[in-house]
């Protein structure tokens, strides 16, 4: 197939508020099973992953992919598919670097849980403990309707009649980690606060920007709704981690997460010698200013907890394997099993399922509460997240399974087909 003759139907929707070493590490560092059957999977059925990816490549929906699966601590599948550069007809590599977008968020979640374990923060802590600007926030509501709720989607050129009311309570770390804070989640308050949230500028810093977010008008009363904050709220937690640890967020994550897990190919800023391994993204029609920031690979000083990482399938599989192991990998314990369970348990009651039936939401990850209702091919209790360009991963404690798919066109059907192919390959 000549991919140049195929259209890649990728579209990336960016909300108004979306602001913004050496050595090759791969999944082979997780030991290979002697056979898939050794860990209760079918070699023949795992081939269906390859068939599914090839089908989508030939259809022109994706340019390529890297897929990886491990069970019971052993690797059973690690394959490259298609092209990392369509114009240059360059084959995908097992160490290709992908733009992770919101797959950055679970890394922030683990970092936050580390501080919870150390007693430096608590989920119930108000954000005003660190930033007084967050003490007396306001909520945008419709007027004259007497209810404290605002529409989630607002045309910034035609803002409806509205009024501001005091927040019923302060927002907390729990609210931000679960996307129930109302901070910069794309509603009326976000539109009214565009100037406070700021533009896309990755030359700023968490220290400068985060206090200004206290001036943002909330989209709803804290704790009353689940609505995704794609690029702002979790940065507040990243800045708190900086304050409590005494080091920049990127250094904390590198020292406390990446280095213990051997994630040597995961960066906000990709070293020059590795930039040839970056996927050349095809089909994303992001506006030029946003694209310049989100795809920047070497010059950022704003180390977001929401987006910005670049990584490989092998590195991210290690991260997921650590979680499915209950917080430990290669003899290095990052979290206790109980803390991982807290992070991966539904913390939002039915607020998330009102948006996505059959699922719950923990601390930065979605949880499978009823896979049938959720139209998932996962086990109840599995958890994970993904990024806007198509990266997706999950950990399944019951099946002792981790799976990662790296693509750079956000095509949900590709993710579903991968998930189905993984699940049907389990034979005990």
Stretches found by the model and what they are:
Residues 410-428:
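Generic C-terminus detector
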Residues 392-394, 399-409:
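Short, well-ordered beta-strand elements
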Residues 25-27:
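Boundary at the C-terminal end of the N-terminal hydrophobic targeting segment
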Residues 30-100, 120-122, 137-143, 424:
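Short, conserved catalytic-motif segment at the N-terminal edge
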Residues 2-13:
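Bacterial N-terminal signal peptides that target proteins for export
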Residues 12-23:
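Bacterial N-terminal signal peptides
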Residues 47-54, 67, 73-75, 98-127, ...:
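Active-site SXXK
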Residues 126-380:
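Short, surface-exposed loop or secondary-structure junction motifs
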């Amino acid at each position: 197939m000549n991919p140049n003759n195929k259209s890649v139907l990728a579209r990336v929707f960016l909300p108004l508020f979306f602001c913004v070493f050496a050595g090759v590490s791969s999944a082979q560092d997780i030991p290979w099973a002697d056979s898939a059957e050794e860990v209760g999977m079918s070699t023949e059925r795992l081939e269906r992953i390859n068939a599914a990816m090839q089908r989508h490549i030939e259809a022109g929906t994706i340019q390529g992919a890297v897929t990886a699966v491990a069970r019971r601590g052993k690797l059973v599948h690690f394959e490259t598919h298609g092209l990392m550069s369509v114009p240059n007809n360059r084959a995908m590599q097992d160490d290709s670097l992908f733009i992770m977008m919101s797959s950055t968020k679970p890394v922030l979640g683990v970092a936050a849980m580390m501080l919870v374990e150390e007693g430096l923060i608590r989920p119930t802590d108000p954000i005003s403990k660190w930033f007084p600007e967050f003490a007396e926030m306001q909520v945008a509501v419709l007027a004259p309707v007497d209810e404290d709720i605002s529409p989630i989607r607002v045309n910034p050129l035609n803002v409806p009649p509205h009024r501001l009311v005091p927040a019923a309570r302060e927002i907390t770390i729990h609210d931000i980690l679960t996307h129930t804070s109302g901070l910069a989640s794309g509603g009326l308050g976000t539109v009214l606060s565009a100037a406070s949230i700021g533009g896309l500028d990755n030359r700023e810093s968490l220290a400068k920007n985060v206090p200004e977010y206290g001036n943002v008008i909330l989209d709803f009363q804290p704790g009353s709704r689940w609505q995704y904050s794609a690029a702002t709220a979790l940065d507040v937690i990243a800045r708190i981690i900086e304050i409590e640890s005494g080091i920049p967020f990127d250094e904390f994550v590198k020292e406390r997460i990446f280095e213990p897990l051997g994630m040597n190919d995961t960066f906000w800023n990709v070293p020059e010698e590795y930039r040839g391994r970056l996927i050349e993204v095809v089909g994303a029609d992001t506006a030029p200013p946003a694209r310049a920031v989100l795809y920047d690979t070497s010059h950022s000083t704003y180390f977001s907890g929401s987006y910005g990482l670049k990584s490989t399938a092998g590195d991210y599989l290690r991260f997921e394997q650590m979680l499915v192991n209950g917080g430990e990998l290669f003899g290095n314990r990052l979290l206790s099993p109980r803390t991982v369970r807290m992070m991966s348990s539904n913390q939002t009651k039915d607020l998330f399922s009102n948006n996505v039936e059959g699922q719950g939401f923990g601390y930065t990850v979605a949880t499978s509460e009823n896979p049938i209702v959720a139209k998932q091919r996962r086990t109840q209790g599995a958890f994970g997240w993904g990024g806007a360009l198509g990266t997706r991963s999950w950990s399944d404690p019951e099946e002792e399974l981790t799976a990662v798919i790296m693509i750079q066109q956000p095509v949900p059907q590709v993710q579903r087909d991968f998930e189905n192919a993984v699940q049907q390959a389990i034979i005990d």
